[in-house]
């Protein structure tokens, strides 16, 4: 993978094929000359995590008229992870250089990434050994995705020029401000968010009860350092609040090294 040729890019998301974020990302990259294939869920799939469709068929169809004319686009009835799996096995004739996800309408920070369909789409690429990047605009209200797309174009070029020794997932969050107001880019560690959540009981028009999960962030916690990074490395949550673009390298290996060492030292089962 080198920066002097067009890159083969696979893009997915969790907001659906018609979302403005994925259109802005795909069109920006295609306009720059990259070979872009988009395979997204056919509708909203936010917070579906890494779920897969196993108990009913997946339906998919090619989509025209939404993207740049050079973009090949498909919609899929499954989840974001389904979409990437389907693309890699049934749509693409060649392995992509990168798997991209987003641009998500809303942040994916801290422990929120464990629920994120956007991050899971990128993670599916990583599981297949493909470098991947998840992009999110850190606001549910802001609708200007172009600064994030412009940064995506820059970052894709940098990753092509300086490939990682092993495939890595970069989780990128962009503050919802103009390009001139972005203070810079920070390499961050994953933070921790705590929510106050309730299941609100409601009644449907027929008088039957149902429940709606509602919640809001009540605390952004400075997570204990389990990663052995220097203490001055900021969390993604803190840096995005200071209007920095955040880049957090992620992996799918969830082994707790300290927990492993504790079990080993105490010889629980020897």
UniProtKB/Swiss-Prot annotation:
Regions annotated as coiled coil: none
Record SUPFAM superfamilies: SurE-like (SSF64167)
Chain positions recorded as a divalent metal cation binding sites: 14-15, 46, 104
Keywords in alphabetical order: Cytoplasm, Hydrolase, Metal-binding, Nucleotide-binding
One Gene Ontology cellular component: cytoplasm
Co-factor: note: Binds 1 divalent metal cation per subunit.
Family of this protein: Belongs to the SurE nucleotidase family.
Protein name: 5'-nucleotidase SurE
Gene that specifies this protein: surE
């Amino acid at each position: 993978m080198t920066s002097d040729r067009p890159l083969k890019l696979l893009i997915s998301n969790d907001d659906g094929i018609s979302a403005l974020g994925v259109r802005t990302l795909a069109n920006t990259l295609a306009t720059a000359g990259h070979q872009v294939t988009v395979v997204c869920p056919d509708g909203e799939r936010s917070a579906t995590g890494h779920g897969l469709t196993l108990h009913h068929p997946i339906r998919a169809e090619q989509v025209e008229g939404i993207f740049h004319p050079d973009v090949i686009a498909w919609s899929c009835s499954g989840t974001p992870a389904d979409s990437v799996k389907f693309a890699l096995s049934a749509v693409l004739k060649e392995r992509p250089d990168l798997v991209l996800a987003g641009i998500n309408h809303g942040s994916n920070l801290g422990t929120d990434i464990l629920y994120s369909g956007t991050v899971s789409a990128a993670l599916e690429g990583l599981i297949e050994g493909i470098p991947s990047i998840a992009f999110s605009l850190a606001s549910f209200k802001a609708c200007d995705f172009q600064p994030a797309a412009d940064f995506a174009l820059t970052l894709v070029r940098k990753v092509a020029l300086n490939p990682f020794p092993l495939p890595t997932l970069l989780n990128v969050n962009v503050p919802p401000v103009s390009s001139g107001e972005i203070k810079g880019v920070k390499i961050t560690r994953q933070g921790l968010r705590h929510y106050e959540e309730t299941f609100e009981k409601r009644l449907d028009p027929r008088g039957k009860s149902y429940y709606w999960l509602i919640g809001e962030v009540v605390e952004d916690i400075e997570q204990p350092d389990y990663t052995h990074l220097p203490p001055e490395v900021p969390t993604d949550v803190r840096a995005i609040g200071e209007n920095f673009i955040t880049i957090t390298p992620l992996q799918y290996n969830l082994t707790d090294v300290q927990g492993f060492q504790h079990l080993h030292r105490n010889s629980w089962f020897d």
